[in-house]
Structures are given as structure tokens and as C-alpha cells.
UniProtKB/Swiss-Prot annotation:
Function according to Swiss-Prot or TrEMBL: Produces ATP from ADP in the presence of a proton gradient across the membrane.
Protein's name in the database: ATP synthase epsilon chain
Naturally occurring in which organism (per UniProt): Anaeromyxobacter sp. (strain Fw109-5)
Lineage of the species this protein comes from: Bacteria, Pseudomonadati, Myxococcota, Myxococcia, Myxococcales
CDD domains: F1-ATPase_delta
Keyword Isomerase set for record: no
Topology of this chain in the membrane: Peripheral membrane protein
Subunit composition and interactions: F-type ATPases have 2 components, CF(1) - the catalytic core - and CF(0) - the membrane proton channel. CF(1) has five subunits: alpha(3), beta(3), gamma(1), delta(1), epsilon(1). CF(0) has three main subunits: a, b and c.
GO MF annotations in UniProt: ATP binding; proton-transporting ATP synthase activity, rotational mechanism
Location relative to the cell: Cell inner membrane
């Protein structure tokens, strides 16, 4: 028996595959899911989502979202999702630097602070996943 993993963004279904294990960056910390996991739902932070298929690891950078587990099916509703091999590292580094520069010029009370902070986290996740 295996898990079905679906990764969906607002733009498209990114992935639908049968896997052995899923590891994801939860809001309360990283966690793993295997066959017959208890049903649950959680918020996701920007970071690395890894799945294992036939003993081989595959990595995605996700920009936050939600994950639901039920009946050996894992559904990821992600703001963004990008396979490690599809990430333009130089573009991600520029996005990280630009967002970090903007963030450093703001106070935490600035209305744009949360959005810039999220951009920094997403860009950092993309760089980390691409470097694997």
C-alpha cells in the first residue's frame, strides 16, 4: 500500500503521484507522513517538501499553504510549488536579496512587512531546494 500525493497551486495541479513517504515544513515544525497516517490538516511554511518514490527522494520548494492527510492521500494546497530542477537559482538569489533589502528598510509595524518577510522565506526555500 502507498500514499497518493497531490500538489496543487492556484494556477494548476503541479503533481499527482504515488509515494512511500512525504516530509513537509509545517507551521509548528517539519513532519513526515507514511502509509496509514492518522487524518489531519495543518498549515505549511515556505520550505522544502520532500517525497520518496521507490527509494528515491524528490524535492519541491513550496511557498506555504495547507496540507491534508486522509485515507492514504496527501493533498498539498500550496501558494507556490517548484521542483528542484526547475528553479532558476540566480533569479531566486536576486529575489532573496531584493526582498531582504526592502525588509531591512521597514519596521515591523509597516503594513508591507509581513508580505516582504514571506517573500524572503519563499526565496530562501527556493535557493535551499535548488542547491540540493
Amino acid at each position: 500500500m502507498a500514499l497518493t500525493l497531490d500538489i496543487v497551486t492556484p494556477e494548476r495541479r503541479v503533481l499527482s503521484v504515488t509515494v512511500d513517504e512525504v516530509r513537509a515544513p509545517g507551521a509548528a515544525g517539519g513532519f513526515g507522513i507514511r502509509v496509514n497516517h492518522e487524518p489531519f490538516m495543518t498549515a505549511l511554511e515556505p520550505g522544502r517538501l520532500t517525497y520518496v518514490e521507490g527509494g528515491r527522494e524528490h524535492h519541491y520548494a513550496i511557498g506555504g499553504g495547507f496540507l491534508q492527510v486522509a485515507e492514504n492521500r496527501v493533498i498539498v494546497l500550496a501558494d507556490t510549488a517548484e521542483a528542484a530542477g526547475d528553479i532558476d537559482v540566480e533569479r531566486a538569489k536576486r529575489a532573496f536579496q531584493d526582498a531582504q533589502d526592502r525588509l531591512l528598510r521597514m519596521t515591523e509595524q509597516d503594513e508591507h512587512h509581513p508580505a516582504e518577510s514571506a517573500r524572503v522565506k519563499r526565496a530562501a526555500a527556493r535557493i535551499s531546494v535548488a542547491g540540493r
